[in-house]
């Protein structure tokens, strides 16, 4: 992998990891276009750029990371538990689910879900506009919605934001809680992959890793900041359209043999 490859993949990871469009398919397509094959070394690289993207979330919400916000973090950890438990118990079955076809169809289904949720969502019925006022019940509901993200192509942020909106949170508040929930979720996932692939780091080009990490951090920071402004004014329908179109294109590429599992 070259430095150019690491820059491109860092940008793609940083932009797509926390937007409700799922980073999985984007990384697959871009890696294919760059001529990169799946390898232990490339998996290690993906872990590093995920950590870079997650660190951007930490910086954005740094003011929330203190003992004064202990009640908020209790709710975040409660929301994290369903994914942690179910993900661990069903880890082998989840791995078997991963096919490019599954990713493509989940893109389309996720896009349709966005339209349905926006159809029934009403700003007048919003009960919570401050992330600190999210209750334990609502946190747990969002946590169970996050479990859907175990299905490849679903989008963790998309699932949790939808769960928050259906629980009475404003779009912005749902996004805030989703990103706070990403901190333990992503660190746990990245930490697990890091330990599993620790031997692969010995043969890595540290410059490539460092560049990917920094680029992913910057891209993620900008993407999340812009998204938080976006959801205060607009619906998720644009992301729904994008997901459906992207899913159809992905199915076409699979059918043509351009992308394979």
Swiss-Prot record:
It is found in: Cell inner membrane. Coiled coil: none annotated. GO terms for biological process: cell wall organization; peptidoglycan biosynthetic process; regulation of cell shape; response to antibiotic. It is an enzyme of class 3 (hydrolase). One of its GO terms (cellular component) is plasma membrane. It is a multi-pass membrane protein. The keyword Transferase does not apply. NCBIfam families: PRK00281.1-2, PRK00281.1-4, undec_PP_bacA. Belongs to the UppP family. This is Undecaprenyl-diphosphatase. It comes from Nautilia profundicola (strain ATCC BAA-1463 / DSM 18972 / AmH). The lineage of its organism: Bacteria, Pseudomonadati, Campylobacterota, Epsilonproteobacteria, Nautiliales.
